[in-house]
């Protein structure tokens, strides 16, 4: 019997926390579906979502100012369990009649939590035990405000040396507050605390599993598509691979895979993709040579958003042409949940677009194909689990992400055939050395960026003006935040040496040491 994987669900209201997406991933790992929405979302949307529980995220602001963000007041009146984390706890306390003040001594980093009442959230959870027999937990704090007076009906359930009210609960109304962050790995028991809230307090049944997601996706695809054919564009990335495999599992020979050779793929990528998918997928694959078409469309375009939208337009037009030849009505896309989050805007406009994703906002409004996006609700790690469950090779599943517009957005400014050729070579050298040194799977994404600037150098006995290549490598769990990868200097020196010696047009190599935020992972 098929499970309803969305039957039990948690709503996470985002107050601007860098950890908001991490909360969502933790809830998913518990086995329960959840969605992330901005904290100013309207009441109708929340009621339509019909959550079994609500989590209020942390945030960078202070509750002590009148103009800062608040939770929708009605969520405290609908009989739904609510968990406030950091800022979420503070706004809950303030809105329900408590007091919040700036603390004289902010807490950032590790703290030891003393549990005063373990009921519900902390039941059976401890890292150590105090001499008085109280459970002690190692937790991660990041706050400058504290709840100084509890709202009516609440009691203190935990404290630290600097926060007498580090956790609070109204057991009757099932409202809970945590001043620390249970979602981060620096709180070792955080997953268990969240599971207590989601499973025991909200009484959610954990149906959100890889097996059930596959079953649900197959059923959904079959119901939508019927006997019609579907085109899926292959890019060599994990998202398109899992999308194609999932669609193929659902409708078999009704799937036609299309690989568009845009001229903007990585070195030798077309041959590699054809080999992998014809061997492992067993589906029909059509390769379309569209190099001239893409170059013509991108000529004179330097704005990153325009390049993304043009790439999306050209992709769709190619698919539509193939669809007309084959009488195909549907386009399968590898849009994933972080794409949706980053491309979303609230009705109030308080959450702004970071960049337009090729799989979301880059699509033409007059697209003639109907769209299916079986991965739209999934984070990247969930997509990879699906791929492994579907039998795709691990090398493909753990391949670094590659943007839909390809090298067009790794060339700063206007794209040219010369720039593409230089970048392909530099990128291939970087990836080859990462694999040879066993660093490839230690970083989450790595690539080269072409900078259309010339810098003076010396080759032989002569001054030489050549282009600049930037190398980018990051470590991340969910691609919502990322840290630059601290690769050994000897390794970077080797890569740099190869690039400037093997690519005559390049005179300088630099390494990007910027986290996300403030930067995005891609340069454009």
UniProtKB/Swiss-Prot annotation:
Pathway linked to the protein: Purine metabolism; GMP biosynthesis; GMP from XMP (L-Gln route): step 1/1
Cellular compartments per GO CC: cytosol
Gene3D superfamilies named among the record's database cross-references: 3.30.300.10, 3.40.50.880, HUPs
Top-level enzyme category: ligase
Pfam families xrefs: GATase, GMP_synt_C, NAD_synthase
Gene Ontology terms, MF aspect: ATP binding; GMP synthase activity
InterPro entries according to UniProt: Class_I_gatase-like, GATASE, GMP_synth_C, GMP_synth_GATase, GMP_synthase, GMPS_ATP_PPase_dom, NAD/GMP_synthase, Rossmann-like_a/b/a_fold
EC number: 6.3.5.2
Residues that hold ATP according to the record: 235-241
Catalysed transformations (reactions): XMP + L-glutamine + ATP + H2O = GMP + L-glutamate + AMP + diphosphate + 2 H(+)
The UniProt record lists the keyword Ligase: yes
Residue ranges of every copy of the Glutamine amidotransferase type-1 domain listed in the record: 9-207
Subunit architecture: Homodimer.
Function: Catalyzes the synthesis of GMP from XMP.
Protein name: GMP synthase [glutamine-hydrolyzing]
Organism the protein comes from: Coxiella burnetii (strain RSA 331 / Henzerling II)
Organism ancestry: Bacteria, Pseudomonadati, Pseudomonadota, Gammaproteobacteria, Legionellales
């Amino acid at each position: 019997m098929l499970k309803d994987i969305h039957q039990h669900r948690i709503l996470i209201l985002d107050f601007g926390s860098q950890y908001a997406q991490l909360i969502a991933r933790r809830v998913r790992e518990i086995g329960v579906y959840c969605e992330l929405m901005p904290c100013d979302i309207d009441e109708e949307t929340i009621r339509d979502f019909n959550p079994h529980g609500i989590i209020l995220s942390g945030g960078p602001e202070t509750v002590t100012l009148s103009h800062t963000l608040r939770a929708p007041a009605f969520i405290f009146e609908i009989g739904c369990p609510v968990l406030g984390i950091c800022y979420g706890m503070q706004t809950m306390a303030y809105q329900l009649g408590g007091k919040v003040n700036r603390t004289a001594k902010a807490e950032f980093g590790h703290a030891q939590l003393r549990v005063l009442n373990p009921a519900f959230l902390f039941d059976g959870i401890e890292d150590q035990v105090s001499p008085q027999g109280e459970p002690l937990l190692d937790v991660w704090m990041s706050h400058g405000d504290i709840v100084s007076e509890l709202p009516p009906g609440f009691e203190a359930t935990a404290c630290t040396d600097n926060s007498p009210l580090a956790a609070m609960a109204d057991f009757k109304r099932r409202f809970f507050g945590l001043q620390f962050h249970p979602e981060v790995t620096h709180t070792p028991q955080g997953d268990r605390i969240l599971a207590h809230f989601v499973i025991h307090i909200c009484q959610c049944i954990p149906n959100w599993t890889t097996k059930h997601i596959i079953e649900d996706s197959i059923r959904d695809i079959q119901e939508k598509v019927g006997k019609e054919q579907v085109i899926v564009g292959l890019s060599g990335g994990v998202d398109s691979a899992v999308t194609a495999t999932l669609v193929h599992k659902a409708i078999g020979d009704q799937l036609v895979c299309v690989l568009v050779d845009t001229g903007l793929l990585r070195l030798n990528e077309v041959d590699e993709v054809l080999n992998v998918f014809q061997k492992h997928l067993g589906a029909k694959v059509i390769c379309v040579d569209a190099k001239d078409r893409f170059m013509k469309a991108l000529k004179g375009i330097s704005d990153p958003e325009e390049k993304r939208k043009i790439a999306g337009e050209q992709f769709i037009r190619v698919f539509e042409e193939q669809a007309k030849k084959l009488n195909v009505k549907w386009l399968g896309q590898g849009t994933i949940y972080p794409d949706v989050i980053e491309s979303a805007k609230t009705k109030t406009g308080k959450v702004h677009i970071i960049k337009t994703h090729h799989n979301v906002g880059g699509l033409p409004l007059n697209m003639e194909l109907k769209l299916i996006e079986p991965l739209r609700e999934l984070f990247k790690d969930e997509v990879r689990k699906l791929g492994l469950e579907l039998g795709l090779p691990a090398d493909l599943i753990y391949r670094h992400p590659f943007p839909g517009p390809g090298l067009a957005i790794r060339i700063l400014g206007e794209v040219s055939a010369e720039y593409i050729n230089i970048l392909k070579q530099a990128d291939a050298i970087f990836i080859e050395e990462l694999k040879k040194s066993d660093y490839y799977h230690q970083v989450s994404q790595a690539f080269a960026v072409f900078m259309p600037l010339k810098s003076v150098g010396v080759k032989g006995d002569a001054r030489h003006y050549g282009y600049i290549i930037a190398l980018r490598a990051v470590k991340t769990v969910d691609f919502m935040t990322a840290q630059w990868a601290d690769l050994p200097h000897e390794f970077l020196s080797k890569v740099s040496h190869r690039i400037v010696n093997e690519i005559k047009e390049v005179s300088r190599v630099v390494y990007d040491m910027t986290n996300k935020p403030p930067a995005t992972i891609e340069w454009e």
